[in-house]
């Protein structure tokens, strides 16, 4: 066996991949929310000061903090979009299960329809046989048409 330089990890199960993705997204979400809270807290602190000399620098800092909050909010929206895409595009097990369930439903419906058709066919055969017996044993049966003229 050649083990030189190739440290390939064993394939991960779907659960491990989902858990890893969940942790990754959770860290990103926590980071963005902390940025939002920190910037909001700092804006509140700055807005309490009413010193005319510091107003220009504090206004600039408030604008910067607001910009940071917007960036963090946009980051959260991007994470949400990624989560939705990840869920939609990579949830093959749910899609496969849904297809399997629909397949079972259609097979059951097919079996039910086939049984129903078979019962109708048998009933039709019995009724036709009864009608034939009644006709051939009837005293009102018309004689066969004569072809001599």
Curated annotation (Swiss-Prot):
Q: Which family does it belong to?
A: Belongs to the Mediator complex subunit 22 family.
Q: Name one GO biological process term.
A: positive regulation of transcription by RNA polymerase II
Function field: Component of the Mediator complex, a coactivator involved in the regulated transcription of nearly all RNA polymerase II-dependent genes. Mediator functions as a bridge to convey information from gene-specific regulatory proteins to the basal RNA polymerase II transcription machinery. Mediator is recruited to promoters by direct interactions with regulatory proteins and serves as a scaffold for the assembly of a functional preinitiation complex with RNA polymerase II and the general transcription factors.
| Gene behind this protein | med22
Its subunit composition reads: Component of the Mediator complex.
Mind listing the UniProt keywords for this protein, alphabetically? Activator, Nucleus, Transcription, Transcription regulation
Which Pfam families does this UniProt record tie to the protein? Med22
Q: What is this protein called?
A: Putative mediator of RNA polymerase II transcription subunit 22
The Gene Ontology terms for molecular function here are: transcription coregulator activity
Does the record's keyword annotation contain Calcium?
no
PANTHER family tied to this protein: MEDIATOR OF RNA POLYMERASE II TRANSCRIPTION SUBUNIT 22
State the InterPro entries in the record.
Answer: Med22 (IPR009332)
Example GO CC term: the record gives: core mediator complex
Look up keyword Ligase and say if it applies: no
Q: Where in the cell is it found?
A: Nucleus
């Amino acid at each position: 066996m050649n083990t030189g330089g190739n440290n390939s990890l064993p394939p991960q199960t779907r659960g491990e991949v989902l858990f890893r993705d969940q942790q990754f997204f959770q860290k990103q979400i926590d980071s963005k929310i902390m940025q939002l809270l920190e910037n909001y807290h700092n804006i509140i602190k700055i807005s309490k000061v009413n010193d005319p000399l510091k107003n220009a620098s504090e206004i600039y800092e408030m604008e910067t903090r607001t910009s940071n909050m917007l960036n963090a909010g946009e980051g959260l929206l991007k994470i949400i979009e990624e989560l939705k895409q990840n869920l939609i595009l990579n949830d093959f097990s749910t899609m496969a299960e849904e297809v399997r369930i629909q397949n079972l439903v259609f097979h059951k419906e097919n079996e039910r329809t086939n049984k129903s058709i078979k019962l109708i066919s048998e009933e039709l055969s019995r009724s036709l046989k009864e009608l034939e017996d009644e006709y051939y044993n009837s005293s009102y049966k018309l004689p066969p048409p004569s072809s001599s003229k």
